[in-house]
């Protein structure tokens, strides 16, 4: 437990800082552009992380929203109830996960449709010999073809959105203070460590996507969708009255809103 508490203390000193929330979006954009430039001008040699079958990609990134949802659900519930003691407010705040799920579903559906309507089925990865009889990606793959369309990076979108959402929700830790005797201490400490590790995985795999996969325009659109999803909720909608609301803070709502304008 002592090692867990030390790890939690370290994460409180990094991910919970206001500067992290302010500059992480810019850091993601910069790393995406730098990684894409590196990929085009001086590609890195193949590595374990460039293999789509690597453990982090298969068991984490492929189900990134499920991991984020399942860890944020108890974290938001416990921390918000600890601070407010109001079940209604907790349920209201948990609706952020429903909003996030809707955003994930709508955006991935848009990406899939764009790839479908801009794509064609080819006989080889070199995009030779168009197979006009195959009208969908699924049908194309079933017949041994290769579908090529404008494939907006779902990884860039989802990893951006998930990382920023976790960092926003962890800002509540400025107000959460529990000692070892508190009934929620172990649960909250464990969730903080788990969410911190998850955030670092999302950022790492975002960098891998920038360096190894997709072209620049596909990653730009994916990252842009992630940033707009984050800012549209936490920066624009959630500070308003009729919304799931922001994580509880002792400071006024106006101060929270001002932090997005700096």
UniProtKB/Swiss-Prot annotation:
<dbReference type="GO" id="GO:0008654">
    <property type="term" value="P:phospholipid biosynthetic process"/>
</dbReference>
<dbReference type="GO" id="GO:0055088">
    <property type="term" value="P:lipid homeostasis"/>
</dbReference>
<feature type="topological domain" description="Lumenal">
    <location>
        <begin position="45"/>
        <end position="57"/>
    </location>
</feature>
<feature type="topological domain" description="Lumenal">
    <location>
        <begin position="212"/>
        <end position="218"/>
    </location>
</feature>
<keyword id="KW-1133">Transmembrane helix</keyword>
<feature type="transmembrane region" description="Helical">
    <location>
        <begin position="94"/>
        <end position="114"/>
    </location>
</feature>
<keyword id="KW-0378">Hydrolase</keyword>
<feature type="transmembrane region" description="Helical">
    <location>
        <begin position="191"/>
        <end position="211"/>
    </location>
</feature>
<dbReference type="GO" id="GO:0140042">
    <property type="term" value="P:lipid droplet formation"/>
</dbReference>
<dbReference type="GO" id="GO:0022604">
    <property type="term" value="P:regulation of cell morphogenesis"/>
</dbReference>
<keyword id="KW-0256">Endoplasmic reticulum</keyword>
<keyword id="KW-0209">Deafness</keyword>
<comment type="similarity">
    <text>Belongs to the FIT family. FIT2 subfamily.</text>
</comment>
<keyword id="KW-1023">Dystonia</keyword>
<dbReference type="GO" id="GO:0005789">
    <property type="term" value="C:endoplasmic reticulum membrane"/>
</dbReference>
<dbReference type="GO" id="GO:0019992">
    <property type="term" value="F:diacylglycerol binding"/>
</dbReference>
<keyword id="KW-0812">Transmembrane</keyword>
<dbReference type="InterPro" id="IPR046401">
    <property type="entry name" value="FITM1/2"/>
</dbReference>
<keyword id="KW-0472">Membrane</keyword>
<dbReference type="InterPro" id="IPR019388">
    <property type="entry name" value="FIT"/>
</dbReference>
<feature type="transmembrane region" description="Helical">
    <location>
        <begin position="58"/>
        <end position="78"/>
    </location>
</feature>
<feature type="topological domain" description="Cytoplasmic">
    <location>
        <begin position="1"/>
        <end position="23"/>
    </location>
</feature>
<dbReference type="GO" id="GO:0030730">
    <property type="term" value="P:triglyceride storage"/>
</dbReference>
<keyword id="KW-0225">Disease variant</keyword>
<protein>
    <recommendedName>
        <fullName>Acyl-coenzyme A diphosphatase FITM2</fullName>
        <ecNumber>3.6.1.-</ecNumber>
    </recommendedName>
</protein>
<feature type="active site">
    <location>
        <position position="155"/>
    </location>
</feature>
<dbReference type="GO" id="GO:0017129">
    <property type="term" value="F:triglyceride binding"/>
</dbReference>
<feature type="transmembrane region" description="Helical">
    <location>
        <begin position="24"/>
        <end position="44"/>
    </location>
</feature>
<dbReference type="GO" id="GO:0045444">
    <property type="term" value="P:fat cell differentiation"/>
</dbReference>
<dbReference type="GO" id="GO:0035356">
    <property type="term" value="P:intracellular triglyceride homeostasis"/>
</dbReference>
<comment type="function">
    <text>Fatty acyl-coenzyme A (CoA) diphosphatase that hydrolyzes fatty acyl-CoA to yield acyl-4'-phosphopantetheine and adenosine 3',5'-bisphosphate. Preferentially hydrolyzes unsaturated long-chain acyl-CoA substrates such as oleoyl-CoA/(9Z)-octadecenoyl-CoA and arachidonoyl-CoA/(5Z,8Z,11Z,14Z)-eicosatetraenoyl-CoA in the endoplasmic reticulum (ER) lumen. This catalytic activity is required for maintaining ER structure and for lipid droplets (LDs) biogenesis, which are lipid storage organelles involved in maintaining lipid and energy homeostasis.</text>
</comment>
<dbReference type="GO" id="GO:0006641">
    <property type="term" value="P:triglyceride metabolic process"/>
</dbReference>
<keyword id="KW-0991">Intellectual disability</keyword>
<feature type="topological domain" description="Cytoplasmic">
    <location>
        <begin position="79"/>
        <end position="93"/>
    </location>
</feature>
<feature type="topological domain" description="Cytoplasmic">
    <location>
        <begin position="167"/>
        <end position="190"/>
    </location>
</feature>
<feature type="topological domain" description="Lumenal">
    <location>
        <begin position="115"/>
        <end position="145"/>
    </location>
</feature>
<feature type="transmembrane region" description="Helical">
    <location>
        <begin position="146"/>
        <end position="166"/>
    </location>
</feature>
<dbReference type="GO" id="GO:0034389">
    <property type="term" value="P:lipid droplet organization"/>
</dbReference>
<dbReference type="GO" id="GO:0010945">
    <property type="term" value="F:coenzyme A diphosphatase activity"/>
</dbReference>
<dbReference type="GO" id="GO:0007010">
    <property type="term" value="P:cytoskeleton organization"/>
</dbReference>
<feature type="transmembrane region" description="Helical">
    <location>
        <begin position="219"/>
        <end position="239"/>
    </location>
</feature>
<keyword id="KW-0443">Lipid metabolism</keyword>
